[in-house]
Amino acid sequence: MMRTLQSAPSSPLAMPEIQFCLLPDACRPLLGKFYREHQSSMRAASKGQAWVAKQEEIIGALCLTPVADGYWLTGLFVAPPLRGNAVAQRLIDAALLPLSGPVWLFCHPDLQGFYRLAGFETAQRLPQALGERLMRYSRSKPLVALHREA
């Protein structure tokens, strides 16, 4: 599944087109390389879908792991020079478009505003597996659980 968005052609320095696509399993090592190159603590989920935003190379990524009757979104990361250009928002939208059901994520409380703009709201309930993870992860850092219907 490939989604392509083009930048505005008004400037000769306009950003090249960005493709949003499901990363084939055979290319999954590229996702780990992308995270490492940017010294991110993110890791590619071993199961589920890996989605990327690409120009000539990967510029953003996220993972969607099936859980209960929905998905758990992890690993959202955009290369620092491209932040502020709605790459993350467009990547989320492209990845969730073919899905149905709930999508959950955990984030630092400071990121709630960003995710609210992407259509997420505070999760009132979590699947048991995610509730247990949230409790475990919250021991070492502040986290909130958010939810969006795909």
Specify the residue positions occupied by each region the protein language model found.
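Conserved acetyl-CoA-binding loop-helix of GNAT-fold acetyltransferases
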Residues: 78, 84-97
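Conserved beta-strand in the GNAT
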Residues: 52, 57-66, 70-77
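Short amphipathic alpha-helix that is part of the acyltransferase structural core
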Residues: 2-44, 52, 126, 141-150
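Conserved GNAT acetyl-CoA-binding A-motif
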Residues: 97-110
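Conserved active-site alpha-helix within GNAT-family acetyltransferase domains
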Residues: 109-136
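Accessory recognition modules or surfaces
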Residues: 88-89, 133-144
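Acidic/histidine-enriched, beta-strand-rich ligand/metal-binding domains
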Residues: 74-75, 81-83, 117
